[in-house]
C-alpha cells in the first residue's frame, strides 16, 4: 500500500483508534452515523432514527462544513438515513452498504470441487456492476470534485467525503491484483481455528453473511484464498487513492488541503476462525486513522 504510506509519511497515524461498537450486525451503519453526527454510539443510534431531521437542523458534518463556507462533495458508500443529495452540494454515484448479493462468492472454495467464483470476472456483478470497478468510479469522482473545487478556489474551500466500498465483500479486484498475491506466499494467521469459539454466546452464527465467505469448518486453503482476495482489493483501492493524491498535487491545492483517512471497522480475515467484523477482537474493532 504505497499510497497509504504516502499519507502516513506526510502526516500522523493513530495506531490505537477503535470503533466504539454497533447496535446491529451492520457495524458500518453505526460507525458512519457516529462519524457524520459526531455523537457517541448511545446518542448516534437516536440520531440515526431521525437523521433527516438532524440534517435539517444543521447537525451533520457536511452541514457544519457548509456553514463554515465550504463547497461540499460526496461519492461512494453512504449508508446513512439522511439523503446524501441534501447533505452535500455535489453528489455522484452514491452506493448502498454493499454491492448486490453474489451468492457464488460465498461458502467457497470447497475442497476437491471447482471454485464457481472469479473475483475479476465482471459477469458476477458486485463491484463490477456497471462495467467499471466501483473503487475506480469513486476515484474518478474525486478527481472530478478536485477540478470543480479548483474553479471555486478563490471563493470557497472544499470538503470532499470520498467513501470507498472496498474492501467490503464480495472482494473483487482486477486479475493483475489477484496475481500479486500467489497463494503459496500467503500466511495463515497464527490464531487460525477451524471453528470460532463461543458463536452462540457472541451471537455470531454461521449463517451471518460475513462468516459465510468461507465454508465451515475453515480450511487453511480457504483462508488463504479469502486473504488473497482481501489483499488484492486493498491494493487496488490503494492505487485509486494514489490517483486522488496525484490529482490533488496537480491541482495546486495540496498544501492547503488536509487529508483524513479512516475506516468504519476492522475484519477478522481468518483470525480466530472469524472472517467478519461482529466481534470484539482487536482485528475487528481497530481501524486505521491517518
Where are these regions (language model features)?
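Formylglycine-dependent sulfatase
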Residues: 1-290
Amino acid at each position: 500500500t504505497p499510497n497509504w504510506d504516502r499519507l502516513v509519511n506526510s502526516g500522523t497515524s493513530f495506531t490505537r483508534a477503535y470503533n466504539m461498537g454497533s447496535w446491529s450486525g451492520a457495524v458500518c451503519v453505526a460507525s458512519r452515523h457516529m462519524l457524520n453526527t459526531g455523537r457517541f454510539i448511545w446518542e448516534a443510534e437516536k440520531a440515526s432514527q431521525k437523521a433527516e431531521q438532524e440534517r435539517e437542523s444543521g447537525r451533520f458534518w457536511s452541514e457544519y462544513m457548509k456553514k463554515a463556507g465550504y463547497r461540499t462533495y460526496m461519492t461512494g458508500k453512504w449508508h446513512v438515513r439522511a439523503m446524501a443529495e441534501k447533505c452535500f452540494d455535489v453528489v455522484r454515484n452514491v452506493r448502498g452498504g454493499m454491492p448486490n448479493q453474489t451468492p457464488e462468492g460465498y461458502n467457497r472454495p470447497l475442497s476437491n470441487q471447482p471454485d464457481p467464483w472469479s473475483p475479476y470476472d465482471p459477469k458476477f456483478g458486485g463491484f463490477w456492476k456497471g462495467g467499471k470497478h466501483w473503487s475506480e468510479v469513486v476515484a474518478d469522482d474525486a478527481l472530478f470534485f478536485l477540478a470543480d473545487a479548483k474553479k471555486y478556489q478563490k471563493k470557497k474551500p472544499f470538503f470532499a467525503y470520498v467513501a470507498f466500498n472496498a474492501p467490503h465483500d464480495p472482494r473483487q479486484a482486477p486479475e493483475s491484483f489477484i496475481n500479486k498475491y500467489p497463494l503459496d506466499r500467503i500466511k495463515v494467521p497464527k490464531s487460525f481455528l477451524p471453528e470460532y469459539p463461543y458463536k452462540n454466546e457472541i451471537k455470531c452464527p454461521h449463517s451471518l453473511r460475513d462468516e459465510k465467505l468461507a465454508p465451515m469448518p475453515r480450511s487453511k486453503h480457504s483462508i488463504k484464498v479469502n486473504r488473497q482476495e482481501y489483499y488484492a482489493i486493498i491494493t487496488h483501492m490503494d492505487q485509486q487513492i494514489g490517483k486522488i493524491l496525484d490529482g490533488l498535487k496537480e491541482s495546486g491545492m495540496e498544501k492547503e488541503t488536509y487529508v483524513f483517512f479512516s475506516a468504519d471497522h476492522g475484519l477478522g480475515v481468518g483470525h480466530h476462525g472469524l472472517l467478519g467484523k461482529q466481534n470484539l477482537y482487536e482485528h475487528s474493532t481497530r481501524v486505521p486513522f491517518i
